[in-house]
Amino acid sequence: MPARLDARATRRYFDSAFNSPAVKILPNEYYVTNGEDVMLSTVLGSCVAACIHDPVIGVGGMNHFMLPEGDIHSPASATMRYGAFAMEVLINELLKAGAVRERLEAKVFGGGAVLSAMQLMNIGERNGQFVLNYLKTEGIPVRAQDLGDVHARRINYFPRDGRVMVRKMAPHHQKAEALIAQREAAAAQTVQAETRAAPRVERFARPGGMPV
């Protein structure tokens, strides 16, 4: 996969508060573990993060997308900024790592109406509804959710056991608002720009009889 269009997160650090190695997930990125004991962390405004894992083997991953779906005829739709593509990439990578589709469980977060521009476009609500509908269609149960509201959120996810720690940031928190405004404004500008064609993702097989 092209690093810029559907990027696997690479920013590693040690989180002293949780005494754990960690990977920072930025907008339009994802990360899937392969049995490693690591925390995945991201900050969300109107964006949504899906945390999905296989509880039997302790493999899990997180994505971070900005918009639900793009024009299916546009090459820009096949990028991690769009939920439809980001969810497909995440699930595909989990299956490649040994997860069993019937055992997958999800927790979803974000979709806040944090910035006035995003409120007008209803982006957060659309993202939240999209991820719930997507998981329902694919038969993946949602074990926990924290969507909507006016708060930015910091998400710390432990894929090995599925734990998630959510910290809501107070409205008008200057540092949080500046960070989110910068990231989401940049992402919004990127969405408007033309992007080169991305390779198609091979769709995962859906077993017969799965609930939709």
From Swiss-Prot:
One GO MF term attached to the UniProt entry: protein-glutamine glutaminase activity
Highest taxon, organism lineage: Bacteria
Protein EC: 3.5.1.44
GO biological process, one term: chemotaxis
Organism field: Bordetella parapertussis (strain 12822 / ATCC BAA-587 / NCTC 13253)
Official protein name in the record: Probable chemoreceptor glutamine deamidase CheD
Function field: Probably deamidates glutamine residues to glutamate on methyl-accepting chemotaxis receptors (MCPs), playing an important role in chemotaxis.
Catalytic activity: L-glutaminyl-[protein] + H2O = L-glutamyl-[protein] + NH4(+)
TM annotation in the entry: none
Enzyme class: hydrolase
Keywords associated with the record: Chemotaxis, Hydrolase
Family annotation (CDD domains): CheD
Taxonomic path: Bacteria, Pseudomonadati, Pseudomonadota, Betaproteobacteria, Burkholderiales
Stored SUPFAM superfamilies: CNF1/YfiH-like putative cysteine hydrolases (SSF64438)
Similarity annotation: Belongs to the CheD family.
Claim: Hydrolase is one of the keywords in the record: yes
